């Protein structure tokens, strides 16, 4: 695994969990409302925000020729530190399936890598440690990443913004059957998306520290859930 930047000041932590709303102390995406109207899109779908995720990554989850419906909350995570949410539903035969769900928000501190509740891991599961201090729990289809982002805030910035030190990117990748992906391949696509988005947000936020974000995702040895549920 290669690393984009290295610094003792920067931290990047990857955590994966089963359900976003089950993570202790991180109910911020419960506020993410004001979602726009869902409308059909032709694959590859338009990105949720400015270039993220890439259409190429999205297409890997889809397989050929699927239609999409997108819902998203306003993209205010950079300026206002407001949680943002985006979801893609794909129309398959006679049903609509969730293909991708993404959340962006800020936090004062990330959960500890060995905290199974905060990480969404199961009791007894151990984090895998990679270069650059990246920790990952390979559980289900959610990939969650926290990275430190120091920003020169104006003196009149609200206290909650001044206290936010970490950006959280959460991606739930759920491939369609027509994509013909194995669980391991689905995990790899999800991790690639997390890093795509994290690098983009870091650039937009103007982090003054070295974020220590890897350029490429850690190698996936296995994935332990049936049919991505």
Predicted features, each with a name:
Residues 36-199, 203, 210-229:
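A small/polar (G/S/T-enriched), proline-flanked helix-loop surface module common
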């Amino acid at each position: 695994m290669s690393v984009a930047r290295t610094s003792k000041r920067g931290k990047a932590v990857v955590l994966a969990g089963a359900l976003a709303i089950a993570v202790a102390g991180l109910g911020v995406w419960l506020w993410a409302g004001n979602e726009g109207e869902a409308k059909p899109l032709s694959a590859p779908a338009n990105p949720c925000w400015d270039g993220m995720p890439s259409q190429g990554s999205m297409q890997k989850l889809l397989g050929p020729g699927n239609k999409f419906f997108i819902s998203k909350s306003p993209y205010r995570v950079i300026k206002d530190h407001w949680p943002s949410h985006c979801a893609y539903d794909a129309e398959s035969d006679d049903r609509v399936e969730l293909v991708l769900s993404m959340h962006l928000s800020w936090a004062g501190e990330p959960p500890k890598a060995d905290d199974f509740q905060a990480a969404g891991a199961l009791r007894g599961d151990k984090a895998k440690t990679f270069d650059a201090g990246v920790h990952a729990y390979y559980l289900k289809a959610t990939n969650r990443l926290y990275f430190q982002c120091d920003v020169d805030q104006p003196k009149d910035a609200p206290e909650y913004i001044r206290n936010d030190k970490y950006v959280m990117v959460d991606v739930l990748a759920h491939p369609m059957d027509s994509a013909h992906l194995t669980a391991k391949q689905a995990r790899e696509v999800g991790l690639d998306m997390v890093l795509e988005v994290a690098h983009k947000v870091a650039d937009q936020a103007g982090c003054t520290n070295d974020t220590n974000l890897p350029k490429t995702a850690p190698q996936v040895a296995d994935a332990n859930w049936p049919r991505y549920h």
